[in-house]
Amino acid sequence: MIKKVEYDPIFITGAERSGSTLIARILDMCGVYSGRCNGMYEHTTITEFTNDYLKDFPFGFPETKDIYIPAHWREAIEGVLIVEQALNKHWMLKSATLARMWSVWNYAYPDAKWLIIRRRTGDVIQSCLKTGYMRVFKNQQNLNSLGFVKEEDGWLWWVHEYEKKFVEMIQAGLNCRVIWPERMVTGDYHQMYETIEWLGLKWNNDIPKVIDPLLNKSREVLINENNS
C-alpha cells in the first residue's frame, strides 16, 4: 500500500483562458506545492496522465455517465508525489482537464477542495480567438463535426461544455468554490482572501503587489468598456 498524503489536494479548474493560472500563482505565494510544472502551473507528468485518459473522447470531453474509473489512479498520482518528496506538503493541481473528468478525481480524492474559476463567456471566447495556441477551432473539420461554421461558435460550445461539468460538480456535492478573478481587476481581493482562509492557508500580504501589475491589460479593457 502506497503511503498516504498528509493533506488532501486543492484542485484548480475552469475553461481555458479563465484566469486559473493567476489563482494558482496566488496559492503558490501562500505556500502550496504545485509540483514540477510548466509556466502555467500545470504539472508536466500528471498532465500526461490526463491527456492519455482523455485522448479517445471527442474533443477530450467525456460524458460523465460514460466515464470509467481507473483502478489505480490515486496510486499513480501519489507515486509522482513520492518522487517529488511532497507527501507532507499542501499541494494543488491546476488544469482545465480536471473538470472534464471530475468524477475520476472525486473518486480518488473525495475530500479534495475544488476551485472552479469563471470568466464571462464572451471574454473567454475573445481570449481564445486571440491566443495562438488555442487552435482546435481554427480547424474547419472540427467545426464541421459540430455543425458550426465560425470559430467563435466552436468556442461558445466549448465554454458551455465546461459549464455543464461545473453544474454536475456542484450538484454532486463536491467541496467547491466558484472564483471570479475579474473582481481583482477593480482591486477587490475579498473573495480571494476568503478562499485562502477556507483552504486553511495563511494570506500573503504581498499578493496584491504581485498580482495587480498582471491585471493591467484587463483593467484597460474594463476602462474602455465603461467609457464606450
Q: What are the residue ranges of the model-derived segments?
A:
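Generic detector of well-ordered alpha-helical segments enriched in charged/polar residues
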Residues: 47-51, 55, 74-82, 122, ...
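Electropositive, surface-exposed helix/loop patches at the edges of structured domains
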Residues: 65-86, 158, 162, 225
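PAPS-dependent sulfotransferase catalytic domain
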Residues: 87-204
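C-terminal accessory extensions appended to soluble enzyme cores
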Residues: 205-228
